[in-house]
């Protein structure tokens, strides 16, 4: 019995450390998902250096409290999988959201974004953000538009003087 208790204590300590180091944590229900589908999601997430694991809710609850994420406690019900990203803030939410569109049994419940507890709405908002490249393109276009307008105006002024 002592070995089993020690193993659980070790799991809580390990998960607490992961929670503290994570940039993003996404928790989702996987009820009714086949092993093959869960494995394919795991491999997709692994390509982006994102850990996916299923923990018992009691272990997840204790680790969340130890990491200072007490507000997660009410959402820790039912079969949950935990995706943890240490590098990219947006990737786990995007990948799981895309996967959930194909597999209706997957439901994002809550998570943590840069050390702040986030509900389903916040995680979905993060998942629906355009990619970094798209945002940079939009920013560049927005910055260049006034310059373009000035150039067109100057050209028109030069043409009227000629």
Swiss-Prot record:
Key words, A-Z: Ribonucleoprotein, Ribosomal protein, RNA-binding, rRNA-binding
GO molecular function, one term: structural constituent of ribosome
Protein name in UniProt: Large ribosomal subunit protein uL10
Quaternary structure annotation from Swiss-Prot or TrEMBL: Part of the ribosomal stalk of the 50S ribosomal subunit. The N-terminus interacts with L11 and the large rRNA to form the base of the stalk. The C-terminus forms an elongated spine to which L12 dimers bind in a sequential fashion forming a multimeric L10(L12)X complex.
InterPro entries documented for this protein: Ribosomal_uL10 (IPR001790), Ribosomal_uL10-like_sf (IPR043141), Ribosomal_uL10_bac (IPR022973), Ribosomal_uL10_bac_type (IPR047865), Ribosomal_uL10_CS_bac (IPR002363)
Species name: Acholeplasma laidlawii (strain PG-8A)
Lineage top rank: taxon: Bacteria
Gene Ontology CC annotations of this record: large ribosomal subunit
Annotated GO biological process: translation
UniProt xrefs under Pfam families: Ribosomal_L10
Family affiliation: Belongs to the universal ribosomal protein uL10 family.
Annotated function: Forms part of the ribosomal stalk, playing a central role in the interaction of the ribosome with GTP-bound translation factors.
């Amino acid at each position: 019995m002592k070995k089993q208790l020690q193993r659980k204590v070790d799991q809580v300590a390990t998960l607490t450390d992961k929670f503290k180091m994570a940039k993003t944590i996404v928790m989702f229900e996987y009820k009714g998902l086949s092993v093959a589908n869960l494995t394919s999601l795991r491999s997709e997430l692994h390509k982006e250096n994102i850990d996916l694991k299923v923990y018992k809710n009691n272990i997840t609850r204790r680790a969340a409290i130890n990491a200072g994420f007490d507000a997660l406690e009410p959402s820790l019900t039912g079969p949950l999988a935990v995706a943890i990203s240490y590098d990219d803030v947006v990737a786990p939410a995007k990948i799981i959201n895309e996967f959930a569109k194909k597999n209706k049994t997957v439901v994002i419940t809550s998570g943590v974004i840069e050390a702040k507890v986030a509900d389903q709405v916040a995680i979905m908002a993060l998942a629906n953000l355009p990619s970094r490249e798209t945002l940079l393109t939009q920013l560049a276009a927005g910055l260049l538009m006034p310059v373009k307008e000035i150039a067109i105006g100057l050209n028109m002024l030069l043409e009227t003087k000629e």
